[in-house]
Amino acid sequence: KTSRILNIEWSPEYAESVRYENASLYHAIRYAVQHPEEVCFSPSAAFHHANPTRGALFCAFSGQVIASMKIYYEFGLCGAYIDLDGHYGNSIDNSRDFVKDIDYAISPVCGNINIMASYEKYLEELRSNLSILRTEITEGRVHYVVFCHGADSHEWDELASQLTTEEWVECSRIVYSFIKEIESQTHRQIPLILALFGGYRRDDYNSVLSLHTADLVTCLNILCGHNIDYLPEVTPRKVL
């Protein structure tokens, strides 16, 4: 079943698009674990509210669970998701009693990091969760990281609001610096995959795109040795 909010009837075309969406994340993870020296990007979203028996909100299938289960069965690897979308991603937790072996595929300790605070408290909780993830990675229990930096955690988004522009970009700095520090500590590269997730600005789509651009630039500067100067352009939301 699809969710009512999607307002889409099942059709061959819709089924095909869902296959591409789910395959995008799976292949990004698969490539990253085989080539950890490269950061992989999946321009995908609409995953983290789906339940095992039905879609929910904008999400038809839990691509996170599908991708990580396939990766586990192929490579025996366990992943963690840093989900900084503006809404709690429930699909992983809702699948734990339904999907066999999911605790081996997505860490039950820190495999589904979501932050439900705002502003400075949000940053504090992110750092605290990453401290737990650091231990899981360095002790060999988590083998890859998927960073889902939804733009709807920005304070001017239509459907959520937690962070200023500066704080939203600071989350990117915190996560990419975290990966860099672990790589320096362990002397090995950590497979890192990026995904889009939420972002709802009917009044100004460019604000969403600018935030995602800022995130990618931060990744390039911290992890890939670039020195790109970019300031996100995010306008206050207009009520339509």
Q: What annotation goes with each model-predicted range?
A:
Residues 3-15:
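Short glycine/proline- and acidic residue-enriched helix-loop micro-motifs
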Residues 12-19, 23, 54-62, 206:
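Short, conserved micro-motifs enriched in small and acidic residues
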Residues 13-27, 120-128:
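Glycine-rich anion/phosphate-binding loops
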Residues 23-38:
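Short, charged beta->alpha transition segments
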Residues 30, 39-182, 202, 217-218:
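Conserved alpha-helical scaffold segments that buttress catalytic/binding sites
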Residues 169-240:
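Metal-dependent de-N-acetylase/amidase catalytic core
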